[in-house]
């Protein structure tokens, strides 16, 4: 009888199984699209030449850093809006969405202007001693792609707002449109018109512009739970923006430090030789597929948990968090198993040397097994804390763990203990273990429950 009553009670919970499936499915497809398109872009750039690959790669490191900052701000807006939805305060939720769109857009324009003014510093100082040919390709790519910063920031903000209301299908469809334009444009301009690096950059700008316009137009639909005001008059609400920044700034710092850490680790990997660089690059691409379900469902966790916290119902928070973590574990076991089975064929497609293929195989097996066990607790669990407003604790834990264990132990295990590139991946998993321990302790002590933003 108790179990039956409990099941009946859960029928009144915020998200049914069908609603969770409708939320998660498009998110997985969207993440899959992003990974595939990234790989397609790399192949197309490679056809322009090695100097172009180097130039584009250097600029992309800067762009990823900037995009991550605005993605973090978008998460802040989504959490605030989601908590208001949970409180049934749709007016305040819409105000949060409007403030997010304006703040992100204007901030992105300011960053774009700064990048243009600092272009020479980036090319000559940040990128260090690069050849004139590489610098030429980087200059062209940076000049064009920088103009897309406001558009990708606006798209990310809009996508986060749609996810906050539980509608991930819109962001998936707009992402599909954006990526289709990008890939088609690259194919035409790179292979057809053969205009080199500009042929890679122009479709990126156009696709992001179209995505921003489409998602903004959809957000102006006043019949949606979350929508933005149809006005060009800017009215900033300092109190609402502070709430968004309370999540966005710690999350942005965490993401930025993570990207910086990756760059520092790459510089270490480069000292291990050409085979190590190749094995690391291939392993990174394949490892992304192993954790893809986790990344997608972590976005769903932000939506679900923020609404439950807004409703001040922590019984639902615990229920959905355990349920979504279980789904991540099952999905990642299946994904990793498939990749293990297909790994010989995947590595064959890369045409690697025996030494590089052996190193990549060891890394992928180690990463896959570790990811199935540790990754959800290291990265999906803190997504719930951010959704509950506990972003600062996540930031402190992640940054300290990354600098000491991921970076410090990369040198210790990889360089001084002689494990080379494999040691760098061992250090990364040590970082995961430390994060997981800290986040599990925080789950049980309950301190993350006291950070609700609204």
Model-derived features: positions:
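Small-residue-rich hydrophobic transmembrane alpha-helices
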Residues: 53-113, 152-171, 266, 277-343, ...
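Transmembrane helical elements of multi-pass membrane transporters/channels
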Residues: 22-41, 144, 178, 207-211, ...
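N-terminal transmembrane alpha-helices
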Residues: 12-43, 47-48, 64-76, 108-112, ...
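Short runs within selected transmembrane alpha-helices of multi-pass transporters and secretion channels
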Residues: 74, 144-163, 171-182, 200-215, ...
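Residue-level hotspots within the lipid-embedded alpha helices of multi-pass solute transporters
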Residues: 31-35, 68, 108, 112, ...
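Short alpha-helical transmembrane segments in multi-pass integral membrane proteins
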Residues: 1-27, 81-148, 192-249, 305-371, ...
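Interfacial/gating helices of multi-pass transporter permease domains
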Residues: 22, 45-64, 132-137, 197-198, ...
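Helix-terminus/linker motif at the lipid-water interface of multi-pass membrane proteins
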Residues: 32, 36-54, 123-132, 188-195, ...
């Amino acid at each position: 009888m108790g179990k039956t009553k409990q099941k009946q009670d859960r029928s009144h919970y915020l998200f049914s199984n069908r609603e969770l499936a409708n939320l998660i499915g498009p998110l997985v497809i969207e993440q899959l699209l992003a990974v595939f398109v990234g790989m397609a872009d790399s192949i197309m750039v490679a056809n322009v030449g090695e100097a172009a690959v180097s130039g584009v790669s250097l600029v992309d490191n800067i762009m990823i850093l900037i995009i991550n900052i605005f993605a973090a701000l978008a998460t802040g807006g989504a959490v605030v809006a989601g908590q208001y939805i949970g409180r049934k305060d749709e007016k305040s939720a819409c105000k949060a969405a409007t403030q997010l769109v304006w703040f992100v857009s204007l901030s992105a324009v300011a960053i774009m202007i700064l990048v243009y003014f600092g272009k020479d510093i980036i090319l000559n100082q940040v990128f260090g001693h690069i050849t004139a040919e590489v610098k030429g390709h980087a200059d062209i790519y940076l000049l064009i792609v920088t103009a897309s910063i406001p558009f990708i920031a606006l798209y990310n903000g809009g996508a986060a707002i749609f996810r906050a209301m539980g509608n991930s299908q819109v962001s998936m469809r707009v992402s599909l449109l954006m990526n289709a334009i990008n890939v088609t444009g690259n194919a035409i301009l790179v292979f057809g018109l053969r205009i080199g690096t500009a042929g890679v950059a122009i479709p990126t700008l156009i696709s992001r512009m179209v995505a921003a316009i489409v998602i903004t137009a959809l957000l102006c639909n006043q019949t949606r739970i979350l929508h933005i005001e149809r006005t060009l008059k800017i009215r900033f609400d300092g109190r609402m923006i502070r709430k968004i920044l309370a999540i966005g700034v710690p999350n942005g710092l965490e993401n930025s430090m993570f990207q910086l850490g990756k760059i520092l680790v790459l510089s270490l990997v480069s000292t291990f030789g050409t085979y190590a660089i190749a094995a690391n690059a291939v392993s990174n691409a394949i490892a992304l597929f192993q954790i893809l379900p986790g990344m997608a469902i972590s976005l769903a966790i932000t939506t679900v948990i923020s609404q439950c916290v807004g409703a001040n119902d922590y019984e639902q928070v615990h229920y959905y968090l355990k349920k979504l973590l279980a789904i991540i574990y099952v999905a990642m076991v299946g994904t990793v198993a498939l990749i293990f089975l297909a790994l010989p064929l995947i590595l064959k497609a890369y045409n690697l040397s025996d030494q590089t293929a052996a190193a990549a195989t060891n890394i992928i097996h180690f990463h896959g097994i570790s990811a199935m066990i540790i990754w959800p607790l290291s990265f999906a669990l803190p997504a719930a804390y951010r959704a509950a407003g506990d972003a600062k604790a996540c930031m402190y834990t992640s940054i300290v763990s990354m600098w000491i264990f991921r970076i410090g132990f990369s040198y210790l295990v990889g360089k001084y203990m002689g494990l080379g590139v494999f040691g760098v991946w061992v250090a990364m998993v040590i970082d995961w273990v430390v994060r997981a321990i800290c986040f599990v302790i925080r789950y049980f002590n309950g301190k993350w429950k006291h950070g609700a933003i609204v």
